[in-house]
């Protein structure tokens, strides 16, 4: 009661905002006469003037009245269209980072030019986001006439464009594109190996058209880039044939005496650390065997830069043969290797070991070696669009989802009043017992409209229902058009003519979006075709255009007299918003129109949520077959059911976001560090930091922190450093000579030895030449382990709900385990990068450059790349990559995290002490 009383006194939040905006509209209107007197060049010159004022410190808010007045005047001259006052209000709403709800036909496309122009003055770029390629191209080409007139550049971002074309599109003041393409470009930008290969600039300001469709309907499906690394089946098989010829050494040699080996061999296997190491003799034998197998050039070393991957596969195969045992670590079922959980003994179907180990086990067992299809990168629309410094949206239907927009995106919804009052008549729903009765009534209504000449738009919830209605109309002899949201350009032309007399158009909810249905048909298209027709003499064009307009005026008046466009819906959608979108197709800009929903108790929504209640009412009223119930209580009951579904879907999306936020925090860290590495020419500091961490970890395995000498395993540590890291550090001799050597001293001695060995390598090759190789190794390692981490997170997510049965909170468990997995990822990167750089043999500067280039080429050799994304109709598509996409197209830098800022993972530690370790 109290909120209603306060609203009646002070007005609603929406009314107060509109009142505030109307005061600015008065200032814009006052400037109109002044700008009308300016010449075209003077008006265009305002753009340069505004930019100078911004550089001098003027804010966009201060410029807004003048900038909007300039755009309005430019629209009158370039487009022959004048922005209404309500469009100015909508433009202010978008500029303030809110969602503008404007009814269909009120001119959202033209409205967007106001905030787009104003924000583009900063030179930081503005992205206009549409639901499909057709609308992106149409709106860009249409509005470019205005932007170009005012001295602004416009780019279009479409799939299949080359990297250079995309860079040009993003470099423009204003860029039009689809939500999917912007997101994929972001992901691809964070997969490149050179800064110059990125296409996006930092994300500044975006206006999302059909914001409800993009940020709500499509939010449950993340954008995923997946692909297969180059097929190496033959490599695994040939290495697998070499392994039985290598003998395992039994016993560990004492570094000082060489004693302790019971049986000499080619490699040692450490069950404790699950690692294998080739002995010196083993190196020579392995090189000889690999040369015989045609995998290694005669006289080449395993540790040459060109053979880094060969060493990796050799060790994976040795581990598969000697450390992973059938029916203990895995089982073979139906020709597949399935991992056994070492703690529970359960089979882990779908899980695969990383680092090529799984393929090595498959080769060992003689089963089919699966070319692993990895997720290369992934992001949800929620997390992508929240990265923009400012975000605005527009749609005809947002108010029903206002809470979700505010809760998830922090976007307030402002309902913009129509330019003219709406006089559309929304009739009560008609509910029938069966589908057959419902469709009979639909056909009868369509026939009645057709016979009197009134245009009809039949809305369906699926392609299947569209085809069913089409079949019924064919049987009834009623001509019609069917649109299924597949061919956007063609369907836009058809829907534009859906307002002509006797037109019957069947369309799924999404078909023809973004195109107005004008009563009497769309004469503008015909006029454009006539103006472009070179065969018609110029002197005749004006007369023929006037004839077309006169004919249209007659048709328009005829349709208005018949009651305007009739909307017939065959089913209620789960969301009231989608139903409102369909209704909004009629009654544009004060035109007449009517709408009615035909339902049956067999409809899915009715059957699940409202059927019993309505059925009871029908039985109580003893309704005969073919008779419909029409009552406000029934419509309210159905809307109540829709609210339940909307609430459930909101919970699903919110839960998805809570889980994705975990990986999103980690994504920010990885992408931020990746971009730092890309932008630096010298990564010595990072490499040195990783080397110290790796050497410390190695030492701590055998010399625990704060331990005494009796607990140290120095002999094993020395052999590990020699075999795995190619470091000869005589620790035992040093310890024996020292009176008081601590475990920290051992760490420092090993770190110093590693630094000295690395510096010697740099001196031989040259620091500058080796820097590029270091950078490539670091990037490749991050990318490889990040992909494996994404797969591990996906696997964790699939089964985490089962923790609820153990009285544990699944979300908390997911956060905890995801944090552990991420820590392991950083450790693996640290060890891998250090191991490669310590053991690789590069003799010259040329060899270093060739090795860096080879790594970059190999990293981009991802085959069968697919792009998974949601469609407008709610389905999910997997598209094969375009050639340009396979090149590794780019995106913007990830959000930067300061070294002393709190870590985004939520641990409470500083970033540099937590997940900033790589930097």
UniProtKB/Swiss-Prot annotation:
Residues binding ATP: 87, 105-109, 516
Give me the reactions it catalyses. Answer: ATP + H2O + cellular proteinSide 1 = ADP + phosphate + cellular proteinSide 2
GO biological process: one example: intracellular protein transmembrane transport
Where, subcellularly, is it found?
Answer: Cell inner membrane; Cytoplasm
* Primary localization: membrane
Entry's PROSITE patterns?
Answer: SECA, SECA_MOTOR_DEAD
Q: What class of enzyme is it?
A: translocase
Single Gene Ontology MF annotation? metal ion binding
What this protein needs as a cofactor is: Zn(2+)
A single Gene Ontology CC annotation of this entry is: plasma membrane
Membrane topology label: Peripheral membrane protein
Q: Which InterPro entries match?
A: Helicase_ATP-bd, Helicase_C-like, P-loop_NTPase, SEC_C_motif, SecA, SecA_CS, SecA_DEAD, SecA_motor_DEAD
Q: How is the cofactor bound?
A: May bind 1 zinc ion per subunit.
**EC number annotated for this UniProt entry:** 7.4.2.8
Q: Which SUPFAM superfamilies match?
A: Helical scaffold and wing domains of SecA, P-loop containing nucleoside triphosphate hydrolases, Pre-protein crosslinking domain of SecA
Alphabetized, the UniProt keywords read: ATP-binding, Cell inner membrane, Cell membrane, Cytoplasm, Membrane, Metal-binding, Nucleotide-binding, Protein transport, Translocase, Translocation, Transport, Zinc
Keyword Protein transport, does the record have it?
A: yes
- Binding of Zn(2+): at which residues? 903, 905, 914-915
Assembly mode? Monomer and homodimer. Part of the essential Sec protein translocation apparatus which comprises SecA, SecYEG and auxiliary proteins SecDF-YajC and YidC.
What HAMAP family does the entry give? SecA (MF_01382)
What is this protein's function?
Part of the Sec protein translocase complex. Interacts with the SecYEG preprotein conducting channel. Has a central role in coupling the hydrolysis of ATP to the transfer of proteins into and across the cell membrane, serving both as a receptor for the preprotein-SecB complex and as an ATP-driven molecular motor driving the stepwise translocation of polypeptide chains across the membrane.
Q: Which family does it belong to?
A: Belongs to the SecA family.
Descriptive protein name: Protein translocase subunit SecA
Q: What is the lineage of its organism?
A: Bacteria, Pseudomonadati, Pseudomonadota, Betaproteobacteria, Burkholderiales
């Amino acid at each position: 009661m109290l909120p209603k009383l306060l609203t009646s006194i002070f007005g609603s939040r929406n009314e107060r905002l509109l009142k505030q905006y109307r005061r600015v509209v008065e200032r814009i209107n006052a400037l109109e006469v002044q700008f009308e007197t300016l010449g075209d060049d003077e008006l265009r010159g305002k753009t340069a003037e505004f930019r100078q004022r911004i550089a001098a410190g003027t804010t966009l808010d201060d410029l807004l009245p003048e900038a909007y007045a300039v755009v309005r005047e430019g629209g009158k001259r370039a487009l022959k269209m004048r922005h209404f006052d309500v469009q100015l209000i909508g433009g202010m709403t978008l500029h303030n980072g809110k969602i503008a709800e404007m009814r269909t036909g009120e001119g959202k496309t033209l409205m967007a030019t106001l905030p787009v122009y104003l924000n583009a003055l900063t030179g930081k770029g503005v992205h206009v986001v549409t639901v499909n390629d057709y609308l992106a191209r149409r709106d860009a080409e249409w509005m470019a006439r205005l932007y170009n007139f005012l001295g602004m550049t416009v780019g279009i971002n479409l799939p299949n464009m080359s990297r250079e074309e995309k860079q040009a599109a993003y470099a423009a003041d204003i860029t039009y594109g689809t939500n999917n393409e912007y997101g994929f470009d972001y992901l691809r930008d964070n997969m490149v190996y050179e800064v110059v290969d990125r296409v996006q600039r930092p994300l500044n300001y975006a206006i999302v058209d059909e914001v409800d469709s993009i940020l709500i309907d499509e939010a449950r499906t993340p954008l995923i880039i997946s692909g297969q690394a180059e097929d190496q089946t033959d490599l695994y098989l040939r290495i697998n044939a070499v392994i039985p010829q290598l003998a395992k050494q039994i016993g560990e040699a004492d570094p000082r005496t060489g004693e302790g080996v019971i049986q000499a061999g080619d490699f040692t296997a450490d069950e404790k650390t699950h690692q294998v190491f080739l002995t010196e003799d083993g190196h020579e034998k392995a090189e000889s065997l690999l040369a015989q197998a045609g995998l290694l050039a005669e006289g080449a070393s395993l540790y040459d830069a060109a053979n880094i991957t060969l060493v990796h596969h050799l060790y994976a195969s040795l581990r598969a043969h000697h450390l992973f045992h059938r029916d203990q670590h895995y089982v073979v079922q139906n020709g597949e290797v399935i991992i056994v959980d070492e703690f529970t003994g359960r089979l882990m179907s779908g899980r695969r070991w990383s680092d090529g180990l799984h393929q090595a086990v498959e080769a060992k067992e003689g089963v089919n070696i699966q070319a692993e299809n990895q997720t290369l990168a992934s992001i949800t629309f929620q997390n992508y669009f929240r990265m923009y410094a400012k975000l605005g949206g527009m749609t005809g239907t947002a108010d029903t989802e206002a809470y979700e927009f505010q809760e998830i995106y922090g976007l307030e919804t402002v309902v913009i009043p129509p330019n003219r009052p709406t006089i559309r008549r929304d009739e009560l729903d008609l509910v029938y017992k069966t589908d057959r009765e419902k469709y009979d009534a639909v056909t009868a209504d369509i026939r009645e409209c057709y016979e009197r000449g009134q245009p009809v738009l039949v809305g369906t919830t699926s392609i299947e229902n569209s085809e069913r209605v089409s079949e019924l109309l064919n049987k009834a002899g009623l001509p019609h058009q069917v649109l299924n949201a597949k061919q956007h350009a063609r369907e836009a032309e058809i829907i534009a003519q859906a307002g002509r007399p006797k037109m019957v158009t069947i369309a799924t909810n999404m078909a023809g979006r973004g195109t107005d249905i004008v009563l009497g048909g769309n004469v503008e298209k015909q006029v454009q075709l006539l103006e472009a027709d070179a065969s018609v003499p110029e002197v005749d064009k004006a007369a023929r255009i006037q004839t077309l307009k006169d004919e249209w005026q007659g048709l328009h008046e005829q349709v208005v007299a018949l009651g305007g466009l009739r909307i017939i819906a065959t089913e209620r959608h789960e969301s009231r918003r989608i139903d409102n979108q369909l209704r909004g197709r009629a009654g544009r800009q004060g035109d007449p129109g009517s709408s009615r929903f035909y339902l049956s108790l067999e409809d899915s929504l009715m059957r699940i949520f409202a059927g019993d209640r309505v059925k009871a009412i029908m039985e109580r009223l003893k309704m005969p077959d073919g008779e419909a119930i029409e009552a406000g209580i029934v419509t309210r009951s159905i809307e109540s059911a829709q609210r339940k579904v909307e609430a459930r879907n909101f919970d699903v999306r919110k839960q998805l976001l809570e889980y994705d936020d975990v990986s999103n925090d980690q994504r920010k860290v990885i992408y931020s560090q990746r971009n730092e590495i890309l932008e630096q020419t010298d990564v010595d500091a990072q490499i040195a930091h990783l080397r110290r961490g790796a050497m410390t970890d190695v030492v701590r395995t055998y010399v625990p922190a704060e331990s005494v000498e009796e607990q140290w395993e120095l002999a094993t540590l020395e052999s590990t450093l020699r075999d795995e890291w190619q470091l000869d550090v005589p620790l035992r001799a040093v310890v024996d000579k020292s009176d008081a050597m601590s475990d920290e001293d051992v760490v420092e001695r090993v770190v110093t030895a590693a630094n000295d060995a690395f510096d010697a390598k740099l001196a031989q090759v040259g620091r500058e030449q080796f820097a590029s190789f270091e950078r490539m190794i670091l990037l490749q390692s991050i990318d490889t382990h990040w992909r494996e981490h994404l797969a591990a997170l996906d696997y964790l997510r699939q089964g985490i709900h089962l923790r609820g049965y153990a009285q544990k909170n699944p979300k908390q468990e997911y956060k905890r385990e995801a944090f552990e997995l991420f820590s392991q990822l950083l450790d693996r990167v640290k060890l891998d990068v250090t191991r490669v750089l310590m053991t690789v043999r590069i003799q010259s500067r040329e060899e270093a450059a060739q090795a860096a280039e080879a790594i970059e080429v190999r990293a981009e050799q991802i085959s069968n790349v697919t792009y998974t994304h949601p469609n407008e109709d709610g389905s999910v598509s997997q598209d094969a990559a375009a050639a340009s996409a396979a090149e590794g197209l780019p995106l913007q830098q990830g959000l930067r995290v300061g070294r002393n800022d709190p870590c985004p993972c939520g641990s409470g530690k500083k970033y540099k002490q937590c997940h900033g370790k790589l930097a």
